[in-house]
Swiss-Prot record:
Primary localization: secreted
Modified residues (Tryptophan amide): W40
Record's protein name: Toxin CSTX-17
Location within or outside the cell: Secreted
A single GO molecular function term of this UniProt record: ion channel inhibitor activity
Length: 40
């Protein structure tokens, strides 16, 4: 499984969905995505 953007996450996993452009943010709480082709 994976976590959709703007949902709660932890650095230990599971991964954010579409992890080409999405990652758990600096505080390890929310999946954030870069804008662009893969960011939506």
């Amino acid at each position: 499984g994976c976590i959709p953007k703007h949902k709660r996450c932890t650095w230990s996993g599971p991964k954010c969905c579409n992890n080409i452009s999405c990652h758990c943010n600096i505080s390890g709480t929310l999946c954030k995505c870069r804008p662009g082709l893969f960011g939506w």
